[in-house]
Amino acid sequence: MCLGIPGQVVEVGKTITENALVDVCGVKREVNIALVCEGEPDTMIGKWVLVHVGFAMSIVNEQEAQETLNALMAMGEVEDDVSAFLYGEESTAKRA
């Protein structure tokens, strides 16, 4: 099963071959946007994408992104693996 985590593109490189910075629950992650970028990379700033293993796999609207994040946060309250992915590896250490 693949799990796509919603994040908002906050910074991009000059070309789509450069990674973008995507905000996932306050954690900035480097993400490759080449699969979803149609045109200039700066048009991606502010868009929500589903991220899987460092790649933006699709563009989603903000409502869908927020609903998915809310569901994942609820899962993270009982599943350390989900929480670690959303908030970074150190989150499980803090909870232990």
UniProtKB/Swiss-Prot annotation:
Query: What are the recorded GO MF terms, alphabetically?
Result: carbon dioxide binding; iron ion binding
| UniProt record, GO biological process | protein maturation
Domain of life here?
Bacteria
Query: Cross-referenced InterPro entries, in alphabetical order?
Result: Hydgase_assmbl_chp_CS, Hydrogenase_HupF/HypC
Family to which this protein belongs: Belongs to the HupF/HypC family.
PANTHER family noted in UniProt? HYDROGENASE MATURATION FACTOR HYBG
Fetch the NCBIfam families from UniProt: hypC_hupF (TIGR00074), PRK10413.1 (NF007721)
The molecule here is called Frd operon uncharacterized protein C
Whose protein is this, by species?
Answer: Proteus vulgaris
